[in-house]
Design a protein with these regions (language model features):
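Long, low-complexity intrinsically disordered segments that are proline/alanine-rich
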Residues: 22-38, 43
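Sec-dependent signal peptide recognition
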Residues: 1-7
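C-terminal motif of bacterial Sec signal peptides marking the signal peptidase cleavage site
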Residues: 12-15
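Bacterial signal peptide processing site
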Residues: 17-21
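Short, well-ordered beta-strand core segments
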Residues: 101-105
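Histidine-/acidic-rich catalytic cores in large beta-rich domains
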Residues: 38-83, 88, 93-97, 107-115, ...
Length: 518
C-alpha cells in the first residue's frame, strides 16, 4: 500500500465574461498543453496545473499519475460557501469516460496525464476543490486544490443579480439543490438554491429547446433542423436532424420512449405546419425515430366520427401551439400539450387519439367528435388552460403548469374559453376507462402570481419537491423561480428581470450534487 498524501495547490484562473457573444460556443481542447505551474510532489499523482475553461465556472485540473498506476475513477467535490444551504457540487468520472473524452492519456504507463474537468465553481471566489483518485488496486489518493476564479458579469444584466424574495434556510427540506433556466439569450444557466450562479458558457444560440441527456445539454436550433450537444466542460458538437421536412425546433425538448421528443415546425404539402408536429429523435446521430402530425391525428379522429376537420385543423395557422410532450411508459403513449386547445394523449405506435383533457368552453368542444373524446373533470378542479410543461409525477399523476390564458388563435367569433387571473401547478389523476379526471393537487401561491405564457413546474426525482418557473410574472417583467417542498411549502423564491419569456421560459432541477460520468 502506498502512503496517502493530500496536496494543496492554489492557482488563479483568468476569467471570461461569457453569456452573449460569438455565434457559438468555443471548444475547449482537453489535450492541450497545461499552463506553466509549480509541480507539487505527491505519491501516486501530482497536480501539474489548473487551467481556466470558457467561463469562470469551469476549470481543468491537470494531474500526473505515477508509473504503473492504473486509474479507475476520479471524483471531485466543491466546498460550499460559508452560509450556503445547497449541497456541494459532487461529480464522479469513470477513467474510461475521461479517456474517451481525451482527458486521460496512456493510463498505466510512465508519466500518464489525467485532466479532471471541474464545473460548478463559484465565480470571483477561492474555491476549495477536493479531488479523489481511485486506482485499480483499491487505493484512494486525496488531492486538494484551491482554485481562484475571476468575477463574472452577465452581459444580459440578469442572471448574476437575482432578487431573493425568500431565501432557503438551513434545514429546509428540498429534493433538489440546483436548477437550470432555459434561456432565449444564450446557454442554459445553472443556479443553486442559494441563488448563486454555478454554470453558464458563452453562446448566442437560444437554449429554450433544451434538455439534459447523458450528463450534458441537448439543444434544438430555433433556426434550423440541427441539434447541439453542449457538455458541462463547455465543448460542443452539432448534429443535423435527419428529417427533410423539419425546418426548426421550438418550445421544449422532452423525454421520449427511446430518444428525445422535439417540438418542431415542418413543411407539409408545401404549407407550413406551425407548432403541430412532434418527433422522437436520437440526439447523438440526429436519426428520426418517430413522427406524429397532430393535425393528422385529430383529422382522423374527427372524420371517423363524421366531423369535417377543415374548420379546426388549419394548416398555415398556429391553431395547435404545441409546447410540451412526454412519454408515458404505462400504456406506451405520448401526452401532448396544445396551448390553444387542451392536453391530449395519443398511442405511441399508431398516433391514434386516446383522450382529451381541456376546457369545454373552448372552440374545440363545439365539435362532437372531439367532445366525445374528452375527460370530465371532477367538481372543483381547474381545467388545463394555456398549459405548459406536461410530465408524469412520481405518483403517476399528470403534472403541468396551468397558466390560465384563454385561446388566442381561434377563428373570429369562436369561443376562447375561460381565462384566469392567476397561474397554478396542477396534478391530475386520470381514469381513462371511466372518461374522468380529478385535480389531485394544486399550488396557486394564494392566487398571487399570473404568468400567462411559457412557464413550467417539474418534480425533483428525490422526494417530489417541485421547481416552479413563473416565466412572465408581474405583467411580463419578471421571471420567478420558486422551490416547493413535498408539502407545497415555499422554500425559496428568486426574481429575475425579463423581457417576454427570454430569461427563463422553462426551468428544471439538475443534479450537480450527484453526477456520475460513465
Amino acid at each position: 500500500m502506498k502512503l496517502i498524501l493530500c496536496t494543496a495547490i492554489a492557482l488563479t484562473l483568468a476569467g471570461c465574461g461569457g453569456g452573449g457573444g460569438g455565434g457559438g460556443i468555443p471548444a475547449v481542447a482537453p489535450a492541450s498543453a497545461p499552463a506553466a505551474a509549480s509541480p507539487v510532489v505527491a505519491d501516486a499523482a501530482t497536480v501539474v496545473a489548473v487551467r481556466p475553461g470558457v467561463s469562470p465556472f469551469i476549470a481543468f485540473v491537470d494531474l500526473r499519475v505515477a508509473a504503473g498506476e492504473v486509474l479507475s475513477s476520479a471524483h471531485y467535490r466543491i466546498e460550499p460557501k460559508p452560509g450556503s444551504v445547497s449541497r456541494p457540487v459532487d461529480v464522479d468520472y469513470a477513467a474510461s469516460y475521461l479517456s474517451g473524452r481525451g482527458y486521460a492519456a496512456s493510463l498505466g504507463s510512465s508519466g500518464s496525464t489525467v485532466t479532471v474537468p471541474v464545473f460548478g465553481l463559484y465565480a470571483n471566489y477561492q474555491n476549495l476543490v477536493d479531488i479523489e483518485l481511485q486506482f485499480a488496486d483499491g487505493d484512494v489518493e486525496p488531492i486538494q486544490a484551491k482554485v481562484d476564479t475571476a468575477a463574472y458579469t452577465d452581459p444580459n444584466g440578469i442572471y448574476d443579480r437575482p432578487v431573493i424574495l425568500k431565501a432557503r434556510t438551513a434545514g429546509a427540506a428540498l429534493g433538489f439543490d440546483f436548477f437550470y433556466m432555459k434561456s432565449a439569450l444564450g446557454s442554459p444557466v445553472v443556479v443553486d438554491t442559494d441563488g448563486q450562479m454555478r454554470w453558464v458558457v458563452p453562446a448566442t444560440m437560444s437554449s429554450a429547446s433544451s434538455a439534459v441527456r447523458g450528463n450534458g445539454f441537448v439543444i434544438g436550433d430555433p433556426q434550423a433542423p440541427r441539434v447541439r450537444r453542449l457538455e458541462f466542460d463547455g465543448t460542443t458538437r452539432d448534429t443535423a436532424l435527419q428529417a427533410p421536412d423539419v425546418t426548426n425546433f421550438h418550445h421544449n425538448i422532452d423525454p421520449g420512449k427511446v430518444g428525445l421528443l422535439g417540438e418542431v415546425d415542418a413543411i407539409r404539402n408545401g404549407v407550413q405546419a406551425i407548432e403541430s408536429t412532434l418527433v422522437e429523435f436520437d440526439p447523438d446521430t440526429g436519426a428520426l425515430i418517430k413522427t406524429w402530425d397532430l393535425g393528422d391525428t385529430l383529422s382522423r379522429a374527427m372524420q371517423a366520427a363524421g366531423d369535417d376537420p377543415a374548420a379546426f385543423v388549419r394548416p398555415g395557422v398556429d391553431w395547435f401551439h404545441m409546447n410540451a410532450a412526454t412519454y408515458d411508459p404505462r400504456d406506451d403513449s405520448v401526452i401532448v400539450s396544445s396551448r390553444e386547445n387542451f392536453v391530449l394523449k395519443i398511442d405511441y405506435a399508431s398516433g391514434d387519439l386516446l383522450w382529451i383533457l381541456g376546457d369545454p368552453a373552448k372552440y374545440w368542444h363545439t365539435f362532437p367528435s372531439l367532445a366525445a373524446r374528452s375527460l370530465t373533470l371532477g367538481s372543483g378542479g381547474l381545467y388545463p388552460i394555456g398549459q405548459h410543461a406536461v410530465s408524469i409525477a412520481h405518483d403517476g399523476s399528470l403534472m403541468l403548469m396551468n397558466d390560465g390564458l384563454a385561446s388566442v388563435n381561434q377563428p373570429a367569433g369562436a369561443p376562447a374559453g375561460e381565462a384566469r387571473g392567476y397561474s397554478a401547478v396542477s396534478a391530475y389523476t386520470i381514469d381513462a376507462a371511466g372518461r374522468g379526471a380529478t385535480e389531485a393537487t394544486r399550488f396557486d401561491y394564494g392566487q398571487s402570481v399570473f404568468s400567462s405564457v411559457c412557464s413550467s413546474a417539474y418534480e425533483a426525482a428525490a422526494d417530489g419537491s417541485v421547481l416552479v418557473d413563473y416565466a412572465v410574472a408581474d405583467n411580463t417583467t419578471h421571471a420567478r423561480l420558486v422551490g416547493l417542498d413535498p408539502g407545497q411549502n415555499v422554500v425559496f423564491d428568486f426574481e429575475y428581470p425579463t423581457t417576454g419569456c427570454n430569461t427563463s421560459w422553462n426551468a428544471q432541477p439538475i443534479s450537480f450534487d450527484a453526477m456520475r460520468f460513465q
